[in-house]
Amino acid sequence: MSDFEPFYDVSRSYEDNYEQGPFGAFAEALKDGNGADAAGTTSEGASEGALATFLGQPVNLPFGIPAGPLLNSRFTTAAFHMGFDLATYKTVRSRAWGCNPFPNVLAVHPKSADGSLTPGSAELDEGVLADTNYEQPISISNSFGVPSQSPDVWQPDMRAAIEAAGPGQVLVPSFQGSRVEGMSEEEYIADHATTARLVKETGAKLMVMNTSCPNAVSYTHLRAHETSLHLV
């Protein structure tokens, strides 16, 4: 690993990152209050100098961090302080949802010198070497299972994350529905709506539905292929 210290520490569990993170420069930004207003100035009524808009919201620069590594309000606030004007709050659910077993992130090492995978290569069937040798440049594979705190935890924390946005900055909540054993398709769709309503209750001005994990229900049944569900 290089001297660069990531703000999400892959050598720690997801739970430890949630409780103790962020790390590195993000931790320093959170401690020192560098960058955007560290006092938690809200962006409402204070974005006259914004240079662009994102889904109708004024932003300084429509560039940020997508759903994934910003686990809670400490992470999103640190991202704001580091100058990312769009910070996406890690995908939430209508219920608590555990993380997949550790380790959740591994470096992958294709055999080719340039790191590419060739059509027809045996690696496509046999897999590639995956380990904790995080050398630069780096390619990774990850498996978290889209964990979530319960709404009793994430709703107040999301409110704090929204309030920490500075002028020209926007907190973007991410959400998804949860499919559990015995749930009908109608109930699955309704769970998406329930989770969106829970997000709206935090005062969020916009939100994004996470469809990046189409195999979250079954490794052989991709929900994203079912246009009949009318999730959007």
Residue ranges and their predicted role:
Residues F175-T195, R223:
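Short, electropositive alpha-helical surface patch
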Residues L71-A79, Y188-R197:
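Short, acidic/polar
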Residues F175-G177, N210-C213:
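Short, structured patches in soluble enzyme cores that scaffold and shape functional sites
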Residues W154, Y188, H192, S228:
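Aromatic/hydrophobic pocket-lining residues that form the small-molecule binding cavity
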Residues M1-V170, G177-V180:
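N-terminal capping/small domains of soluble enzymes
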